[in-house]
């Protein structure tokens, strides 16, 4: 977990009682590298009760900081393709989102000026902890540091009617 003001989040851990504990004396931030197996092994040795408590009611930030790439897969399940009136693609439709659009669970989402068809989808996010290229399906789990819930927000008028597909 990351907590604090936007742009100033600190790394934390949620203890067994649900309290947020401050990990900043041990790691600078929660990043893909922090979530690598060797780093996780070190963090597991820390007794959460020994860590300072975060202030009560503190803002929860995005789960991971220093995101370099946010890659998404369009029409990633048959029901969504059907709902959108589109064919299931033969190959994955990949697109990116800018890292500065990632916000915490209770943060406001910036709505584009002129938006008329704002849409959202609940997605699962995979946090990758190292460089990956041409990874086999069998090896893919070794690159996944963790999972998060993602609320994918899109402006469908801009995406489909104005540009004809994925856009940036």
Language-model features, listed with the residues they occupy:
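N-terminal non-catalytic cap/leader segment that marks the start of a structured domain
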Residues: 1-92, 166
């Amino acid at each position: 977990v990351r907590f604090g003001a936007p742009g100033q989040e600190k790394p934390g851990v949620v203890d067994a009682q649900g309290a947020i504990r401050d990990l900043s004396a041990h790691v600078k931030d929660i990043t893909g590298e922090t979530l690598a197996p060797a780093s996780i092994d070190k963090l597991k040795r820390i007794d959460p009760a020994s860590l300072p408590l975060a202030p009560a009611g503190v803002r929860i930030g995005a789960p991971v900081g220093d995101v370099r790439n946010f890659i998404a897969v369009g029409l990633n399940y048959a029901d969504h393709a059907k709902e959108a009136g589109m064919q299931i693609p033969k190959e994955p439709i990949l697109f990116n989102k800018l890292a500065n659009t990632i916000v915490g669970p209770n943060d406001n989402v910036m709505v584009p000026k002129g938006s008329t068809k704002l849409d959202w989808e609940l997605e699962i996010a995979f946090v990758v902890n190292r460089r990956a290229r041409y990874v086999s399906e069998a090896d893919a789990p070794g690159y996944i540091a963790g999972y998060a819930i993602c609320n994918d927000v899109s402006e469908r008028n801009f995406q489909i009617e104005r540009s004809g597909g994925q856009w940036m």
